[in-house]
């Protein structure tokens, strides 16, 4: 359930970004699956870890499909304040197949009201 997923995300505390979950499992199945350090790749200066070799290879073929928008930075602070703040899965939204991470619930809500102002900023 959504409540169970939110509780699992919250249990990771103040960890930012994807909080140790596999981005491929998140994107393809909307599942929170633990990533493993032995399966990792870099994309746009960011390191990502995956639950399996299969997921790593999927990511390597199409990294832009699986990596969070703006490398996981809060796109609202990037656009509105030219400030690069790391987002977190605690405040996340799917929009047109891309995962957006935010540093606060307020910024997530701003994005959801007017996503066209922010989409495409990388």
Task: List each model region and its residues.
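Charged, low-complexity intrinsically disordered segments
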Residues: 1-122
């Amino acid at each position: 359930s959504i409540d169970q997923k939110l509780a699992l995300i919250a249990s990771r505390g103040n960890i930012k970004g994807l909080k140790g979950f596999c981005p491929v499992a998140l994107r393809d199945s909307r599942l929170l699956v633990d990533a493993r350090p032995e399966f990792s790749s870099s994309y746009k200066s960011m390191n990502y870890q995956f639950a399996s070799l299969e997921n790593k290879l999927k990511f390597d073929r199409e990294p832009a499909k699986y990596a969070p928008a703006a490398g996981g930075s809060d796109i609202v602070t990037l656009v509105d304040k030219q400030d690069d703040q790391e987002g977190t899965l605690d405040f996340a939204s799917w929009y047109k197949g891309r995962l957006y991470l935010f540093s606060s619930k307020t910024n997530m809500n701003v994005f959801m009201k007017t996503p066209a102002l922010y989409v495409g900023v990388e």
